[in-house]
A protein has these predicted regions:
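Short beta-strand edge/turn micro-motifs at domain boundaries
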Residues: 107-136
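Generic short beta-strand segments
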Residues: 89-97
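Basic/polar N-terminal segments that are highly enriched at the extreme N-terminus
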Residues: 1-10, 135-136
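A solvent-exposed, acidic/Ser-Thr-rich amphipathic alpha-helical stretch
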Residues: 9-15, 28-84, 91, 104-105
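Short helix-adjacent coil turns
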Residues: 19, 26-27
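A short, structured loop/turn motif at beta-sheet edges
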Residues: 78-87, 114-120
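Solvent-exposed loop/turn segments at secondary-structure junctions
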Residues: 48, 94-95, 129-131
Length: 136
């Protein structure tokens, strides 16, 4: 990997870490700070069509069912698509208040789409889908 790609990979990882830390703090503004204005987020049963909509939904969730939660994230891959785009695939899950492990039934495969704008890596899209339990 070239030095510039290594720097890009580190910058993308930093964006993800910042988003995870903001989630743990219940900070919806911080969680979407590195989202593009036109970012989309798709999760089972929902489509959120902008950074503002994602922020609004997360703020409500952090006051309710996601209060005091954090996330489990294991990066499975990162690949670049041209000079200014990248895709990260991870296994993720929500650790609800008091949980120390995410049960297999709570894990998702997540896809993060990154775009480099004005030299900064930003999240342009997010999608997740439940991980099938063994034997399914």
């Amino acid at each position: 990997m070239s030095d510039s790609r290594a720097e890009d990979e580190a910058a993308i990882q930093a964006v993800l870490v910042d988003s995870y830390k903001a989630w743990e703090a219940g900070d919806a503004d911080g969680m979407v700070a590195d989202y593009t204005a036109d970012a989309t987020a798709i999760m089972p049963g929902s489509l959120r069509e902008s950074r503002d909509v994602v922020r609004e939904n997360m703020a409500l969730a952090f006051e309710g069912p996601l209060k005091d939660s954090s996330t489990y994230n294991k990066r499975l891959s990162l690949r670049f698509v041209g000079r200014d785009a990248a895709i990260v695939v991870s296994e993720s899950g929500i650790l609800f208040a008091g949980q120390t492990d995410v049960p297999d039934t709570g894990k998702v495969n997540a896809t993060w789409v990154f775009e480099k704008r004005d030299g900064q890596w930003l999240i342009a899209g997010y999608h997740n889908s439940p991980v099938l339990a063994p034997g399914q």
